[in-house]
Amino acid sequence: SDVYKRQDYDLYKYDRKGVYSERKLKKNPWLMSPHQVYIANDIAYVVARNGDTFKDLGKEFDISWRKLVKYNDLQRDYTLMEGDIIYLKSKKKKASKPYTVYVVKDGDSMHGISQKYGIRLKNLYKMNRKDGEYVPEIGDRLRLR
């Protein structure tokens, strides 16, 4: 019953590591450890890792890097930081049902809140009748829908 050993069927050939050339792995490091995809407000997102770029994420998910910049309300020269939430599709106009009001905590920004709840930044400002100059302060109550 050693008939079922992996080697007997040459299954090792199908291991992911063996499939890619070293050159391809250097150009596409995510092939070895793809990003985990999460969902918020019915939209897929990933959490950036140290050294990630919009171009790398775009390649991994077959999305133009310009779209990723736009979906996430960022500037094209923004440098991704470990822990950044990066949406793979356009965010929504408002948060999902249970989330109606958010109370601002220390360190919050409008962009951070918009990323956390998957809401377009301009809609978060509009819903709360705030302009681009507004900086949230601890205790402020912001509508999410």
Task: Go through the PLM ranges and name each one.
Residues 12-39, 66-70, 78, 91-95:
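Long, low-complexity, acidic/serine-threonine-proline-glutamine-glycine-rich intrinsically disordered tracts
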Residues 66-75, 97, 125-131:
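N-terminal post-signal-peptidase region of extra-cytosolic proteins
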Residues 12, 54-56, 75-77, 110-112, ...:
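Short beta-strands and strand-coil junctions in structured, solvent-facing domains, enriched
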Residues 30-62, 92-126, 137-141:
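Primarily a LysM-type cell-wall glycan-binding module
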Residues 1-4:
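Short, small-residue-biased leader/transition segments that mark boundaries at the very start
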